[in-house]
Amino acid sequence: MTLLALGINHKTAPVSLRERVSFSPDKLDQALDSLLAQPMVQGGVVLSTCNRTELYLSVEEQDNLQEALIRWLCDYHNLNEEDLRKSLYWHQDNDAVSHLMRVASGLDSLVLGEPQILGQVKKAFADSQKGHMKASELERMFQKSFSVAKRVRTETDIGASAVSVAFAACTLARQIFESLSTVTVLLVGAGETIELVARHLREHKVQKMIIANRTRERAQILADEVGAEVIALSDVDERLREADIIISSTASPLPIIGKGMVERALKSRRNQPMLLVDIAVPRDVEPEVGKLANAYLYSVDDLQSIISHNLAQRKAAAVEAETIVAQETSEFMAWLRAQSASETIREYRSQAEQVRDELTAKALAALEQGGDAQAIMQDLAWKLTNRLIHAPTKLLQQAARDGDNERLNILRDSLGLE
């Protein structure tokens, strides 16, 4: 059994590739079923966010394992293998464990130490539990990563400063508009990232917030919290002209805001500028919108410079966190190795018990037939001893014949011989 982590993220692939490799929530079960149908895969978890798509797997070792899994990923998303290989990373066993712990702790995030990723990892794991998780080692690896992430957050200052993609989006808005108290903001979506954006905006006393979402009930809960108006996604075209700032983050596979829609809004606004921050993957706003005069479009990749500015105070904490991850990875791998030994021990004990039961049954049968008890017990002891020491004796003899003193000493130690 081998543990694997493979995928792409914001450091290895542009958003144009990440959106093609992402797994939409409504097709995740289908993807997991397809993945687990691969003969080498024993268990799997798919983590797909704005900034990464990763597969965490428990697999049987085989020739061309990497090629087979890359081929599956490319076939599933209709991708060119060469395009994917340039951006793909591949971690195995110790490195896979360490990678997951770093991801869950926010150490591999676009925003160092951001807490949202832990919830996303937990959801990915929960989704895999719906009839898809088959490997206890993989399950244990995820459970361990959750406890490591909690330890990192409580024992270090990794989460001390408020930096996230949501915070960066609001920072960008404050840099462009002198005061948010005079602007109208349209939020498209009502997921976790938009919730954070809305709360940041409320803290900065934005004049008016409008939330557009496919599901009105979810949007209304957020709107009640932050004092916003709720509209349907189908109303975005009509209401877009009211918005000075548009921040969008949905799970839509296709763009929601097109170039024509923004052109009409700008015309109604008499070309007053609009800031559009698209933090969705796949993108919610057509890239061509950025070519329009007075439309300032930023994607998740464009937020990098803002985020980088806020990282200084987290870097020292990250060093401490990396030490924790290294320690916990080492402990997990020790547990994993012990599991392998435990299976061997169980097999060895079971074999010895079979020999014992077989010889004991024969001895009891002989006693029932009136045989001499002392002779039967001596015969049982002699046969039991010979059967149990037969295999170790052959190994000792072979090591001696080979002149392999190191193996001979290992066997002596394992048999408790001084």
Curated annotation (Swiss-Prot):
GO BP of this protein: protoporphyrinogen IX biosynthetic process from glutamate
Active site: 50 (nucleophile)
Organism encoding this protein: Shigella dysenteriae serotype 1 (strain Sd197)
Subunit structure: Homodimer.
Upper taxonomic lineage: Bacteria, Pseudomonadati, Pseudomonadota, Gammaproteobacteria, Enterobacterales
Family: Belongs to the glutamyl-tRNA reductase family.
Its job: Catalyzes the NADPH-dependent reduction of glutamyl-tRNA(Glu) to glutamate 1-semialdehyde (GSA).
Binding site for NADP(+): 189-194
Record protein name field: Glutamyl-tRNA reductase
EC number: 1.2.1.70
NADP among keywords: yes
Domain of life: Bacteria
UniProt xrefs under InterPro entries: 4pyrrol_synth_GluRdtase, 4pyrrol_synth_GluRdtase_dimer, 4pyrrol_synth_GluRdtase_N, GluRdtase_CS, GluRdtase_dimer_dom_sf, GluRdtase_N_sf, NAD(P)-bd_dom_sf, Shikm_DH/Glu-tRNA_Rdtase
Note: During catalysis, the active site Cys acts as a nucleophile attacking the alpha-carbonyl group of tRNA-bound glutamate with the formation of a thioester intermediate between enzyme and glutamate, and the concomitant release of tRNA(Glu). The thioester intermediate is finally reduced by direct hydride transfer from NADPH, to form the product GSA.
